[in-house]
Amino acid sequence: MTTIKLYKHFFILFSLTILLGCGKPDTSQLIDKALEAEHRTPSYVQRDKYRHPKETLLFFGLDPEQSIIEITPGYGWYTEILAPLIRNKGQYSYTSLRLHEKINPFFVKLESAFKEKMEKNPDIYDQLRWVHFNPKQPEFAPN
C-alpha cells in the first residue's frame, strides 16, 4: 500500500471514530439530569439514596427511545424520572387498576392524585399515555 492510501484509510477510520463519539447522549448522563430536575418532589429526591434509581434503570438497560409501560405508578416517583427521560424519542404509558365491576377507593384516590400531578406539569408530562389495564385480562400493550 502506498503512503497516500494508508493516510486515506487512517483518515476514514479516524473520522468514523469521531462520529461514533458524537452519537446520542450517554443514558447515564440523561438519568443524572432527570434525577436533578426541579420538577421532582423533594421527598422523592430524598428516597433516591435508598432506591438507587440510576443503578436500577441502567441495570434494566433503559434507552431514551424505548416504549415504557409503568403498571400502577402510584404517586409518580418513577414517573418523575422516566417521563422526561423518554419524552422526546420514546413513549411512556401508564396503567391503573381500574376494574370493570369494582373500583377500590384507594386506587381511585391514587389515580386522581397522579393525574392531577401530571396536569400541573404539562411541559414534562404532556406526552404520557394512559392504557387500560384489567388484571383479569392483562393485555395492555397492543403492537
What are these regions (language model features)?
Residues 2-11:
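Bacterial N-terminal signal peptides that target proteins for export
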Residues 19-21:
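C-terminal motif of bacterial Sec signal peptides marking the signal peptidase cleavage site
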Residues 23-25:
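Bacterial signal peptide processing site
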Residues 30-59, 63:
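Class I SAM-dependent methyltransferase Rossmann-like catalytic core
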Residues 65-74:
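Conserved class I S-adenosyl-L-methionine
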Residues 75-88:
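Conserved SAM-binding loop of SAM-dependent methyltransferases across substrates and taxa
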Residues 123-136:
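Conserved SAM-binding strand-loop segment of SAM-dependent methyltransferases
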Residues 138-143:
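A short acidic, Gly/Pro-enriched loop at the edge of an enzyme's catalytic core
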